[in-house]
Amino acid sequence: ARTVGLTVFAAAGLILAGCGLGPGEDTGDVSLLVTRDYGSKVLVDEPALPANESSTAMRILDQNSDLETSYGGEYVQSVDGISGDTSGSRSFDWFFSVNGIVAERGSAQFPVGGKDKVWWDYRDWTDAMEVGAVVGAYPAPFSTGYDDRDWGVQIDCLSGEDACRMVTNQLEGDGVRLKDTGENMIVRVGLIDDVLDTPEGQRINKGPGASGVFVRFAAPDVGAPE
């Protein structure tokens, strides 16, 4: 009886393996952008690629480039011959974002579909390993949400009513849903001193190593025209 039971179980396993689960249903088109040096050079630009329930950030890249991986297929090592490397004291690798947010889990486990924007960038991360978001994906993530979370956007007007009104109009015109309650992304608008007084502003003032933001604030030239 034991032998028969094992045989039936094994046969069932072979049948299931033979059938396979397939790629799943279509989930809409995604865009794929592959660049280097923080987007300064475009290598691949595909605005509409078909995706399905098995599509991931890595699989979309693999289907549209010559991809090499490491660490058991979990890490992108090389794209079209451009490989992660160390040169002197500088380190270079591939990073990806979805809808403007740099993902916190591996690309092989990150599902994509339904108008998601997938962006891979090869860059020197020596001075700033943690870059939380990329402005080049705008209006994402404000208009798209992220990782199946449909966030709204709340505007925090620190100062400058005209500037706040302009930002509000711009966001709404770009399809962003503004709301004041629930889980939201916050856009702070104000004079530089007011912005730098916030926790986020204090991180920005510490440089890209602390904030991931490459920006330097300087006093305006008094003699320059407005």
Predicted regions and their residues:
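Sec-dependent bacterial lipoprotein signal peptides
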Residues: 1-17
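Ubiquitin-like/PB1-type beta-grasp interaction modules and other compact soluble beta-rich domains
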Residues: 18-226
